[in-house]
Amino acid sequence: MAAGCLLALTLTLFQSGLIGPSSEEPFPSPVTIKSWVDKMQEDLVTLAKTASGVTQLADIYEKYQDLYTVEPNNARQLVEIAARDIEKLLSNRSKALVRLAMEAEKVQAAHQWREDFASNEVVYYNAKDDLDPERNESEPGSQRIKPVFIEDANFGRQISYQHAAVHIPTDIYEGSTIVLNELNWTSALDEVFKRNRDEDPTLLWQVFGSATGLARYYPASPWVDNSRTPNKIDLYDVRRRPWYIQGAASPKDMLILVDVSGSVSGLTLKLIRTSVSEMLETLSDDDFVNVASFNSNAQDVSCFQHLVQANVRNKKVLKDAVNNITAKGITDYKKGFSFAFEQLLNYNVSRANCNKIIMLFTDGGEERAQEIFAKYNKDKKVRVFTFSVGQHNYDRGPIQWMACENKGYYYEIPSIGAIRINTQEYLDVLGRPMVLAGDKAKQVQWTNVYLDALELGLVITGTLPVFNVTGQSENKTNLKNQLILGVMGVDVSLEDIKRLTPRFTLCPNGYYFAIDPNGYVLLHPNLQPKPIGVGIPTINLRKRRPNVQNPKSQEPVTLDFLDAELENEIKVEIRNKMIDGESGEKTFRTLVKSQDERYIDKGNRTYTWTPVNGTDYSLALVLPTYSFYYIKAKLEETITQARYSETLKPDNFEESGYTFIAPREYCNDLKPSDNNTEFLLNFNEFIDRKTPNNPSCNTDLINRILLDAGFTNELVQNYWSKQKNIKGVKARFVVTDGGITRVYPKEAGENWQENPETYEDSFYKRSLDNDNYVFTAPYFNKSGPGAYESGIMVSKAVELYIQGKLLKPAVVGIKIDVNSWIENFTKTSIRDPCAGPVCDCKRNSDVMDCVILDDGGFLLMANHDDYTNQIGRFFGEIDPSMMRHLVNISLYAFNKSYDYQSVCDPGAAPKQGAGHRSAYVPSIADILQIGWWATAAAWSILQQLLLSLTFPRLLEAVEMEEDDFTASLSKQSCITEQTQYFFKNDTKSFSGLLDCGNCSRIFHVEKLMNTNLVFIMVESKGTCPCDTRLLMQAEQTSDGPDPCDMVKQPRYRKGPDVCFDNNVLEDYTDCGGVSGLNPSLWSIFGLQFILLWLVSGSRHYLL
C-alpha cells in the first residue's frame, strides 16, 4: 500500500514538472513537451505542404475539368459483369473438355488391344527426350517425333502446334504393352486438340491424364526447358497432380490404420512410414483423413482425434507423427478396426461425407476380424484397402480377404520401388461408381489454384473423367466395364481471369477477389506464392520475395480468404455467404495491411459479392469510399495529346522532372517492361507512330496517363521549378492513379527506388487511407545503416470534391534531409537556460533519449548519433523495454499475421543419396563388414539394385549431381509470422514510469497532430537496465498457429454437391493379388552371389 502511494506521488510530481530522474533538474512538464511537439509539427507540416504543392495540384485538377469526366464505379454492376465474363470463359473451356472426353471414350472403345507392335509402329513425341541426350532414339515398337519448336508468348516457352507431347513417369517402362496400346489409341486425340484450338485460339494446355500414368498434352513442348533448369530430376506423375486427383474420384473420408506391433520393426516399419506419407499425397483439400496406429490397443498417431481436412498443414502433422511411431507388442486387428470404424462413422465433425475408406498397412497376420466387419460394415459402405508391407512369410490370405469382402483392394509393397505405384492405384477402385453412374458423373469440376508444371504460373483446371465404355450397349443398361480410363483437363491461367476483372479504375486500394467452396482464394492481391519447385514457373512477385526453386512445390496453393486479409467477424460472415453462393454487400471499417507488410491502417471498405454461375466459385469487389468515382480523361484533340506526351520524353526530364510510367498493357503491340527507360522510349515511339486512339490500344488507359502527365508537368513548371531551393528538402514527387511518377529535380529521380507501378506503391496506398501527412521510414532491414541518407519520405493524398463527388487522383510529397531535420529537432527541444542534464533533448545526452517514431513503431529521428544510424529500424530492436511499455499503455496495438506462402532455408542440409527418401544408403564401412549383409538393410539394397537392373529407368529419377541436389533444395516452403504495430486510439498524450524492478525510467509521449508521428522523451536506457529481449517486427520463420487447436474449430466449407461412392452394379471381385514387382528367386540368388564376390574379392575397388 505504501509503495503504491509513493508511486502515485512520484507520478504526480513528475507531471507537475517538479522532479526528474536525477533529482537535479525537473523533468520537462507535459505542457513544455507539448509546446515543443506543436512547434515540430507546425514546421514539418508547413514544410511538406509548401514544398509538395498538394494544394496547387488540386487546383490544377479543378481548373481543367473540361478535360475529364467523373464516372461512377457501380460495384454491383461491375462485379456481376465480371462474374458473367468469367462464367463465359470457363463455359467455353468446358465445351472443349466435353469434346475431348467424348472422343477419348469413342476412340478407346473402338481400339483393338494388341500384344505386339511392329518396329517403330507407334509414333509419338516423348516430352522428356531432351532430358537425356544419350537415351535411345525409341523403345521397341515406337518411333520418336522431333517437333520444330517456336517461342510462344502465350505459354512463355517453346511449343509446337503441330504435335502433342507425351509424358511417361520415370518408373513406368515406355516399351510395355500397356503403354504402347495407350500411345496408339490416344494419338487420335491430337486432332481434337487441334480442332479445339481452331475454335478457341486462347486455349492453353489440353491434357489427358491416363490411369496408367501416361499424360498426353497439347501443344507439344519439352518437359523441362534445359536453358532454365538444366539436369533436374523428373518425379512428375500425372496421377498425383491436384486436378487428376479431384477428377478421378469423389471426395474421400479416409482412416489410415497402421500396424505397429513388434513384427513390423526395422525395414518394414520404414517402408510403412514412407507408404503412409505417399498415401497422404494422394489426398486433396476436398478430402478428410486421420492416421491411427494399433497393436494390442489402438490410438491416434497425432493430436488429431477425428478426421481432419487433408490440407498441407494437417498432412504435415500426420507425416511427422507417423515418422515417430515405434513398433512393439502384438497385433490385434479387432482393436484396430473397431477404432477405425468408430472414428470413420463419427458424423459430428466436419468431413467429406462421401467415399469412406480404411487403409490398412501391416506385415500380415492370421486374424480376419470378421465380427468387426459384420458389426460395422454389413452394407459394405466402407471400403477396406489392405497393404502387405515388407518381405515376410505370413499368409496373405487374411488381409486379402479383408479387402475383397469390403469392396476394396489388396496390394503388396515388398520394397521401396513399389510404394508410389501401389499407394495411388486405389483411385481406380474409387472410380468404379463414377463409371457406372455414366452421364450423371460427367460433370465438369474446377480445381483449387495450383502452380502449373508447364510454366503457366497459377492456374485452375477444368476436369472431366473419361470412362471405359467398351462392351456398353447403346441404351447403357449392359454395363460390362467399370474402369476409369483417366481424366481430361483444360487449364485456365489466373492471368486470363484477371483480365476480366479490370483494376485501373478502382484506385490502388480497390480490388477483386474470388474464392472456392473451401474458402481458398483464386484471385486476390495477396495471393503470391513463391515458385520453389524444379520446373515451376517464375511469376511476378513482390521484390522482397526470393525467387528460388525446390521440388517440394507440387502442393496446391491454398490461401484462405481469412488468411489473405486481416480477419474480423464481418469477413467471416462474408466468406460463409460467398461459399453458400449468395449475393450481398457490406460496408464496414477494417484493418488493412500495407503493401510492404510493415504497417496497418484503418479504412472503410465496401464488399460486394456474387456467385459465378456454372461453377462453385464466388467473386467479390472491394472498394474504399474514395473509389466510388474515378476520372475518365477525354483528350479528344490530338494536339493536346501530343503536347502532354511530349512531357514524357527523357529529353525533358531536366525541366519536367525524372518521369516513370506504370508498366501496364496500354496496347497489344506494346509489351510492358521492368526497364522504365526502355519502356518509356517504346511508349513514346508507339504513341507518336500510331496515336493513342489506335484500335489496338486501351484508349482510356492511354488518355488517363497523358492527362496525368500534363497535369503533373504543370505542377513542376508552374510551382516546383519557381520555388527557390528549400532547406531540408532533397526531392519532391507526385504519383498518380493514371500511372505517372515525377521526381524533381532530375538527379533525385535517378536514385528513385519506388515501384513505377503506382498501384503497387506501399506509401501511395497508405496515403490514400490517411488524411494526415504520412512519414515513411526507410527500409533498415533491407538497406541497413545509412538508408536514411536518401531522405525520409513525406506524402499526402490530393483530395478533390468534383460536383460533390470525392476523388483522390494523386499523392504528392517530399523527401526530407535527415541532417536538417535533426538540426531543427534539436533546436526545438532545447531549453535555455537549462543547467541540468534532463531538462531537454540535448544532442547525445547521456541521460535522456528523445526519439520520433512513426505509427508502425519505426525510428525516424533521435537526439543520439548512434540512433541516427538506425533510422528506419523497428524501435523494439533498439529499446525493447520501452516499446513493450508503449504497447502496455495502449499507445500501440499490434496484429500478428502469418504468411503461408513463404520460402525459407532448410533447417538442416539433407544427405545426398541415390535412393528414395526412405531408402537406406550404406556406408563403405557397412559394405566391407560381411556381417552387415545379414541385416534387413542389406536386403533393402538388394531389392533396389535388382529393381534398377530389371527396370533400369525406375530409379533414374533419383540420380543427381551434388550441386544440382544442393541447389534444388536450397529453399523450402514454410510459414513465417510478422507483427505489425499501429496506433490503438486517438489519445494524444501519455506519461508515466517504466518500472524495471530495481529502477525506473520517467517518460512522456506526445503525438504530432496531422501526421503519423509520435514524440517520446524518456530517461536513457543506459541509466536503468531493463528487459533487453528484442521485440521483433520483421518476418520470422514460424510453426504457425497450432494445427491441433485449429481443427477443433474448422472454418466453414462446402464439399461437392454430388457423390459417387457406391453402385449396386459394381463388380468388386477384382480385389488384388501379387505385386508385379516381385523379383524371381533365381535373380535374387544371382545378384547376391555377384555382390558377395565384389565384397570379398574387390575391396580395393570399393575403396
UniProtKB/Swiss-Prot annotation:
Residues 1-24 form the signal peptide. The modification Phosphoserine is found at S119. Disulfide bonds join C404-C1059. One of its GO terms (cellular component) is plasma membrane. It is a single-pass type I membrane protein. The alpha-2/delta subunit of voltage-dependent calcium channels regulates calcium current density and activation/inactivation kinetics of the calcium channel. Plays an important role in excitation-contraction coupling. Binds gabapentin, an antiepileptic drug. The MIDAS-like motif in the VWFA domain binds divalent metal cations and is required to promote trafficking of the alpha-1 (CACNA1) subunit to the plasma membrane by an integrin-like switch. Dimer formed of alpha-2-1 and delta-1 chains; disulfide-linked. Voltage-dependent calcium channels are multisubunit complexes, consisting of alpha-1 (CACNA1), alpha-2 (CACNA2D), beta (CACNB) and delta (CACNA2D) subunits in a 1:1:1:1 ratio. This is Voltage-dependent calcium channel subunit alpha-2/delta-1.
